[in-house]
Curated annotation (Swiss-Prot):
Pfam family, one: ECPIP
Family statement: Belongs to the EPCIP family.
Gene name for this UniProt entry: Epcip
Protein function: Likely to be involved with PKD1 in the detection, sequestration and exocytosis of senescent mitochondria.
Record note on modification: N-glycosylated.
Name this protein carries in UniProt: Exosomal polycystin-1-interacting protein
Glycan attachment points: 46, 59, 199, 221
GO cellular component: extracellular exosome; migrasome
Subcellular location field: Vesicle; Secreted, Extracellular exosome
Secretion signal span: 1-44
Entry keywords, A to Z: Glycoprotein, Secreted, Signal
């Protein structure tokens, strides 16, 4: 009987003990292994995830989508590097971009008139925000996730499906499609909505409250499509 018990113990996984449940660490590890395996078999392009941790910003490349605001899982299976807020620059993302945030100032610092087509914004907290607009360039699809009490915690919006050709790869100044995002939508008081205005040629004069166009003037010899998301 003793040899039988010894053999049984030798073949028992270290994540388990007799008559007990698996530890939380083992569950997290098994979940991560499953996600990595899924990403391997689907051969999906890595997604970019940006979130704040303390006074730094974490920029991560992930094999698959990570559950909203699961920082432990993101650090476990994604390849991440820390960036100081002062080092953030205007940039472009050619794939999916997900941002987890807890305050609007950080979100504004990360976006900073970013050039991105497919964006997901997840509010990892219960803060409420006043009306304030952030500018995004080239946005085609927006997804949001909040922890609000409103039933519409997760919403999606298709802004447009028109392509800008090669302009996406020439820098944010060449952007033809500009979206203004009202951060009050994260309060979850209503469903996600938008409206667009075509053929706008003078952004600085038509939208004087946005400093983006004063510090970095947009070319005036072309027509823009402006979308307001609220």
């Amino acid at each position: 009987m003793d040899w039988l018990m010894r053999e049984k113990q030798e073949h028992t996984s270290p994540c388990w003990t007799r008559m007990t449940s698996p530890s939380s660490f083992c569950l997290l590890l098994l979940q991560a292994l499953g996600i990595v395996a899924l990403g391997h078999f689907t051969k999906a392009q890595n997604n970019t995830l940006i979130f704040t941790k303390g006074n730094t910003i974490r920029n991560c490349s992930c094999p698959v989508d990570i559950r909203d605001c699961d920082y432990s899982l993101a650090n476990l299976i994604c390849s991440c590097k820390s960036i100081l807020p002062s080092a953030m620059e205007q940039t472009s993302y050619h794939g999916h971009l997900t941002i987890w945030f807890t305050d609007i100032s950080t979100l504004g610092h990360v976006l900073k008139f970013t050039l991105v087509q497919d964006l997901k914004l997840s509010l990892c907290g219960s803060s409420t925000f006043p009306t304030k607009y952030l500018a995004i360039c080239g946005l085609q699809r927006l997804r949001i996730h909040t922890k609000a009490r409103h039933p519409s915690r997760g919403q999606s919006l298709l802004i447009h499906s028109r392509r800008e050709g090669s302009s996406l790869y020439k820098g944010w100044q060449t952007c033809m499609f500009i979206s203004f995002l009202d951060v009050a939508l994260f309060n979850g008081d209503s469903s996600l909505k938008s409206y667009s205005i075509d053929n706008i040629s003078s952004l600085a004069s038509d939208f004087p409250d946005f400093s983006y166009f004063k510090t970095s003037p947009m070319p005036s010899n072309r027509s823009y499509v402006v979308t307001v998301i609220y």
